[in-house]
Design a protein with these regions (language model features):
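Structural signal for short hydrophobic segments within the conserved structured cores
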Residues: 35-37, 97-99, 130-133
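A short beta-strand-turn-helix
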Residues: 40-65
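Short loop/turn elements that flank and shape the SAM/SAH-binding pocket of Class I
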Residues: 45-46, 106-108
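Short pre-active-site segment immediately N-terminal to redox-active cysteine/selenocysteine motifs
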Residues: 63-66, 70-74, 117
C-alpha cells in the first residue's frame, strides 16, 4: 500500500514537472509575427507625417509602406475587418506596417483626413501619395492593394 502511494505521488510530481517545463519552453519562444499598431496623435507625428511642422507637404516618415485603419470600437464592419488586418500584419511582417487609429479618441486625426465613414483605410506607399479607401473590404482586396500599391509587385 505504501509503495502504491509512493509511486502515485512520484508519478504525479513527474507529470507536474513535465507540464511546467513545457510551459516554460513555450513561454520562452519569441513570437515574431507582427500585430497591428495603435496610433495616437503623438505617434502619428513621429511615425507617419508631421503635419504640424509641414502642413502643406506630405513627407512620410516611415521606413516601410503602411496601412492605417481608421475605426471605432462600436463599429460592426470595423470589428469584422480587424482580424483580417491582424492576419495581414503577420503575413506581411517586415514588409509593411498596419496601424490603427481610433476615431473616437483621435478626433483630430479623423478630421485631418476627413473621415466621414468607417472603416476607412489609408494606404501609404514609400515614394508616392497616399490613397484612401472606405468601407469594409475582403482580404483579397487588401492583398491586391498591398501588392499593387504598397509593394508594387
Amino acid at each position: 500500500m505504501i509503495k502504491r502511494v509512493l509511486f502515485l505521488t512520484v508519478g504525479i510530481l513527474s507529470l507536474m514537472l513535465a507540464v511546467c517545463e513545457t510551459k516554460a519552453i513555450n513561454n520562452g519562444k519569441k513570437e515574431n509575427k507582427m500585430k497591428t499598431i495603435e496610433l495616437t496623435k503623438a505617434d502619428f507625428l513621429k511615425k507617419i507625417v508631421d503635419y504640424e511642422k509641414n502642413p502643406e507637404e506630405w513627407i512620410y516618415l516611415g521606413d516601410k509602406p503602411a496601412i492605417i485603419d481608421f475605426y471605432a470600437s462600436w463599429c460592426g464592419p470595423c470589428k469584422m475587418v480587424a482580424p483580417v488586418l491582424e492576419e495581414l500584419a503577420a503575413e506581411y511582417d517586415g514588409q509593411i506596417y498596419v496601424y490603427k487609429v481610433n476615431t473616437e479618441q483621435e478626433q483630430e486625426l479623423a478630421a485631418l483626413f476627413n473621415i466621414r465613414s468607417i472603416p476607412s483605410f489609408l494606404f501609404i506607399p514609400m515614394n508616392d501619395k497616399p490613397q484612401m479607401a472606405m468601407g469594409a473590404m475582403p482580404k483579397s482586396s487588401f492583398k491586391e492593394a498591398i501588392d499593387g500599391v504598397l509593394l508594387k509587385k
